[in-house]
C-alpha cells in the first residue's frame, strides 16, 4: 500500500506490505487520510533490482541503459521502504546483477518502458524479479536523485559506478540529448527567399 505517486517512498514502511484484510484497510486508510489516495499493488516475492536509463541524443528510440543493480536486504527486510532508503541505509547493500541473461532482460524492459512513456533525459526503473526470472516493473523514477556523495551513493550512482564514462559521461550525454531534442522540435515550414524561414515548435 503506497502513496499514489511514490513520492520518495513517503510513508512506505515495513507495515505497508500487508497480508490480511485488516492490514490492508489499516494501511489504505492511513495513506488515503494523509495523501488523498493510495496505490495498492501486488507484492512480488523475489529480488529487487534497479536500472538507470538515459536518453540517446542520436536515436531516442534506443536509450542507453546502465549496469542493473540488485539489492541485498538485511534480515527481516524484503523491500526498499522509507527507512531503508533514508535511515537504515547502511544495512542495505547492493551488487551488479550477475546473470548476463537476466541483466540483459532488465535492460531491455527498462529501455522499452522508457520509450513507451516518451521518456526524456533520464530515469531509473525499479523492478522485482520472481523465482522464475520473470521481471515485474514497479515504477520509473523520472529525473531520479543522482550525484550523491560517494559515501552515501544513491541507486543511480551505483549504476554509474560500473560504467567507464561514469558521472561525467552520463552528464555529457544528457546535455547532448537536450540539445538534440530541442533541434528536433524546431521544424522549418517555409522560406521567404531572403534567407529567413518560419519555424514552429513541435
Language model: regions and residue ranges:
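Conserved anion/nucleotide-ligand pocket segment
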Residues: 1-25
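Short small-residue beta-strand/loop micro-motif enriched in glycine and branched aliphatics
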Residues: 8-10, 91-93, 150
Amino acid at each position: 500500500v503506497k502513496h499514489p505517486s511514490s513520492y520518495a517512498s513517503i510513508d512506505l514502511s515495513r507495515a505497508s506490505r500487508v497480508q490480511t484484510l485488516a492490514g490492508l484497510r489499516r494501511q489504505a486508510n492511513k495513506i488515503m487520510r494523509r495523501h488523498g489516495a493510495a496505490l495498492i499493488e501486488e507484492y512480488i516475492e523475489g529480488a529487487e533490482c534497479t536500472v538507470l536509463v538515459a536518453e540517446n541524443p542520436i536515436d531516442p528510440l534506443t536509450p542507453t541503459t546502465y549496469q542493473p543493480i540488485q539489492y541485498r536486504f538485511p534480515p527481516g527486510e524484503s523491500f526498499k521502504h522509507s527507512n531503508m532508503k533514508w535511515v537504515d541505509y547502511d544495512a542495505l547493500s547492493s551488487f551488479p546483477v550477475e546473470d548476463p541473461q537476466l541483466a540483459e532482460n532488465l535492460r531491455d524492459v527498462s529501455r522499452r518502458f522508457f520509450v513507451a512513456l516518451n521518456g526524456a533525459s533520464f530515469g531509473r526503473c525499479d523492478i522485482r524479479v520472481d523465482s522464475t526470472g520473470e521481471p515485474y516493473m514497479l515504477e520509473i523514477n523520472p529525473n531520479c536523485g543522482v550525484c550523491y556523495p560517494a559515501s552515501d551513493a544513491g541507486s543511480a550512482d551505483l549504476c554509474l559506478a560500473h560504467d567507464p564514462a561514469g558521472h561525467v559521461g552520463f552528464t555529457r550525454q544528457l546535455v547532448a540529448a537536450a540539445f538534440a531534442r530541442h533541434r528536433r522540435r524546431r521544424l522549418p515550414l517555409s522560406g521567404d527567399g531572403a534567407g529567413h524561414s518560419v519555424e514552429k515548435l513541435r
